[in-house]
Swiss-Prot record:
Organism this protein belongs to: Human papillomavirus 19
Domain named SF3 helicase: residues: 406-556
Name of the molecule in the record: Replication protein E1
Binding residues annotated for ATP, in chain numbering: 432-439
Gene3D superfamilies: 3.40.1310.10, P-loop containing nucleotide triphosphate hydrolases (3.40.50.300), Zinc finger, large T-antigen D1 domain (1.10.10.510)
Subunit-level organization: Can form hexamers. Interacts with E2 protein; this interaction increases E1 DNA binding specificity. Interacts with host DNA polymerase subunit POLA2. Interacts with host single stranded DNA-binding protein RPA1. Interacts with host TOP1; this interaction stimulates the enzymatic activity of TOP1.
Any one GO biological process: DNA replication
Length: 604
């Protein structure tokens, strides 16, 4: 018999177990099932009685109170500082003899369900700290040194420490900080006077600063009220805000956040009175004399009565005596005169300063031009060389002319004709190669005699010759072919020494003669046939040699004002200049020009 394929079942599992469910006809009866569905084996499972309202409102109220209490405790934990009690009594906190663990009142109240917890809480409440919001306490003078750390910590916690310092300053001194100062935006702007307010300074350091600041300042003003210390410092040299802060931080051992600094108001009478009266109290300290801006506004003197009125004639007289004819020069120099001149103070206080400066400059030019026209050439040279300080030697000029192979006698003769305005002899030409010293020689002469320089570059303007009507001697430097053509065409009469019509700006053409004229050029006009009509009107001297220089690149021949002063003094007779007019016709000393309303013998 063949074996069956596949696996063989183990013993005991070879037969199938067939079970058959027993069915009954009762389960198929639907009506009976529905009838039995409402019945329950558990009695009174559902309460079918009427419901009552109860006390739900009280329950809701309790839940709301509990939720609010939890929210309040969270806010307390978030915003209240655990060290706030130290600000209430810092001295009491500092006298603790031994460290001990301080218990704090619980933020979240616990349910007291027993006697032991109640007794424990009562024992802890005896030494508990009450947490309150941090307060900015204002210490008295005696408690300041012990409260420095508290003040500084409160200042660092503030979002706007500058606003806090401003408020504390006004509370301490009764005025705002900016009522006494003007604002400097930049930290690099320098000023001699500074107003400095420092918050929470130790008493010992403040006392030492009174002595240390004296070596840096001409005037020291210090006053302390509560935690604020106010300084007015007038330094010997100008300092910027950064330098001032470094000085105060090192001297007072403070942080930069504790310092306010601005320059004082110099023209505010109320601010000046604050500083003047502040030093009279018992708590103030001062060193040095009052600054000028405080003394002028608080101390009554004879200058105050004079400073109220401005005299333009006095300003014109000052500018005339000091040879100030430029508007910017007059304005700057007269403003510098204000500390010692009451009229300058009144001018600074006037609203029409610019108009007065323009009028002053115009009047000085008129006076100077009239004075120049009245003086002869000898008087003009004598007045100019006596304005030169120092002494030189005329031989420097003679040696330079000899170096350039110029006959000194012929040059003196040409210079004499030039100064005396001899017709057809009032123009000298210096010609030669470049770098021979032509311009240096002529410029030095023009400088000492206060002459004018005209430039052909302005020849397109019909007023380019106007400076010739305002001087005794003039220079036309570096004459080129276009300039020679212009002179040959239009300036023959002027070079002859005759009266010409000269067009001037803002006025009608005037009748005048050309002054003594110096020319420099690289062209020898006497060798040019095209300019033959200029040969008899111009005297020429050649400079053929390069200008000599020393090893240190300085000129070997120093053509200075002192050299020309010595030249004219030594050769005064050879140039046939008139005698020195130091005295009048009757032997009396000549009176200086007066253009102010002040009398000659009036007290200054």
């Amino acid at each position: 018999m063949a074996e069956s394929k596949g696996s063989t079942s183990k013993e005991g599992f070879g037969d199938w177990c067939i079970l058959e469910a027993e069915c009954s006809d009762v389960e198929n009866d639907l009506e009976k099932l529905f009838d039995e569905d409402t019945d329950s084996d558990i009695s009174d499972l559902l309460d079918d009685n009427d419901l009552e309202q109860g006390n739900s409102r009280e329950l809701f109220h309790q839940q709301e109170c509990q939720e609010s209490e939890e929210h309040l405790q969270k806010l307390k934990r978030k915003y209240l500082s655990p060290k706030a009690v130290a600000q209430l009594s810092p001295r009491f906190e500092s006298i603790s003899l031994s460290p001990q663990q301080k218990s704090k009142r619980r933020l979240f109240a616990e349910q007291d369900s027993g006697l032991e917890l109640t007794l424990t809480n009562e024992a802890e409440d005896v030494s508990s700290e009450v947490e309150v919001p941090a307060l900015d306490s204002q210490p008295v003078a005696g408690e300041q040194s012990g409260d420095i750390d508290i003040h500084f910590t409160a200042l660092l916690r503030a979002n706007n420490n500058r606003a806090i310092l401003m408020a504390k300053f006004k509370e301490a001194f009764g005025v705002g900080f900016y009522d006494l100062t003007r604002q400097f935006k930049s930290y690099k702007t320098c000023c001699n006077a500074w107003v400095i307010s420092v918050y929470a300074v130790h008493d010992d350091l403040l006392e030492s600063s009174k002595q240390l600041l004296q070596q840096h300042c001409d005037y020291v003003w210090i006053r302390q009220t509560a935690a604020m210390s106010l300084f007015l410092l007038c330094f010997k040299v100008g300092k910027n805000r950064g330098t001032v802060h470094k000085l105060m931080m090192s001297m007072l051992n403070v942080h930069e956040k504790q310092i306010l600094s601005e320059p004082p108001k110099l023209r505010n009478t109320a601010a000046a009175l604050f500083w003047y009266k502040g030093c009279m109290g018992s708590g103030g300290f001062t060193y040095g004399p009052y600054p000028d801006w405080i003394a002028q506004q608080t101390i009554l003197g004879h200058q105050n009565a004079e400073a109220s009125s401005f005299d333009l004639s006095e300003m014109i007289q000052w500018a005339f005596d000091n040879n100030h004819m430029d508007e910017s020069d007059i304005a700057y120099q007269y403003a510098k005169l204000a500390p010692e001149n009451s009229n300058a103070v009144a001018w600074l206080a006037h609203n029409n300063q610019a108009r007065f400066v323009r009028e002053c400059a115009a009047m000085v030019r008129f006076y100077k031009k009239g004075q120049m026209k009245e003086m002869s050439m000898s008087e003009w040279i004598y007045a100019r060389i006596h304005e030169v300080d120092g002494e030189g030697h005329w031989s420097t000029i003679a040696k330079f002319l000899r170096y350039q192979q110029v006959n000194f006698i012929m040059f003196l003769a040409a210079l004499k004709d030039l100064l005396h305005a001899v017709p057809k002899r009032n123009c000298i030409l210096i010609y030669g190669p470049p770098n021979t010293g032509k311009s240096a020689f002529t410029m030095s002469l023009i400088r000492v005699l206060k002459g004018r320089v005209i430039s052909f570059v302005n020849s397109k303007s019909q007023f380019w010759l106007q400076p010739l009507s305002e001087c005794k001697i003039a220079l036309l430097d570096d004459v080129t072919d276009p300039c020679w053509i212009y002179m040959d065409t239009y300036l023959r009469n002027g070079l002859d020494g005759h009266v010409v019509s000269l067009d001037c700006k803002h006025k009608a053409p005037i009748q005048t003669k050309f002054p003594a004229l110096l020319l420099t050029s690289n062209i020898n006009v006497h060798n040019e046939v095209n300019y033959r009509y200029l040969h008899s009107r111009i005297q020429g001297f050649e400079f053929p040699n390069p200008f000599p220089m020393k090893a240190d690149n300085t000129p070997q021949f120093e053509l200075t004002d002192q050299s020309w002063k010595s030249f004219f003094t030594r050769l005064w007779q050879q140039l046939e200049l008139s005698d020195h007019e130091e005295e009048g016709e009757n032997g009396e000393s000549q009176r200086t020009f007066q253009c102010s309303t002040r009398s000659a013998n009036e007290h200054l």
